[in-house]
């Protein structure tokens, strides 16, 4: 199934047209999916708002890197391999497997503290919270430190990480905490990351539309 934004724009009825099968010249890109028992292949074409006249190959490589980092963060818990069994999700970007990025550095030997999981039953379902303090910069090599900072860096990635059924919805920030003055992302708090799990039954309370 596919959409064509040019076809939608040209349709006088204003309808949202949905097409079956590959667009002309695109079938070869979809061929790898035929060898899989199940899965989803996402193909973006005609990215005229992204690939502009000034766009270079370096810009495109940077974009791919940013997409990979975002996928590794948003789906990291589904991509992680459990002690027994297979990961719930496997992602490939240009035939390259996306490796999960763990914002809490679970298992790092220099991690000073993390709390046990605190669970509370709410009218919308079970909510679980874990607090994590990450290692000091001295515990990392320079590449490790940069990777642990996340896509947006150490200061921007501090705060709450809100998950719905294992998928990350919010990556950092303090969700309006603070009496009279909201907390901001500051250098002094950059080692603090809090994991908050909510169920899909809490969508209305959290105003989630997925």
Residue ranges: model-predicted function:
Residues 1-83, 87-93:
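GHKL-type ATPase core
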Residues 7-9, 47-50, 77, 97-99, ...:
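Short loop/turn segments at secondary-structure transitions that flank enzyme active sites
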Residues 10-12, 26, 51, 105, ...:
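A broad, structure-centric signal for solvent-exposed, well-ordered loop/edge residues
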Residues 63, 67, 100-101, 110-210:
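Charged regulatory segments coupled to nucleotide-binding catalytic modules in large multidomain enzymes
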Residues 72, 76-122:
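Accessory nucleic acid-recognition modules appended to NTPase machines
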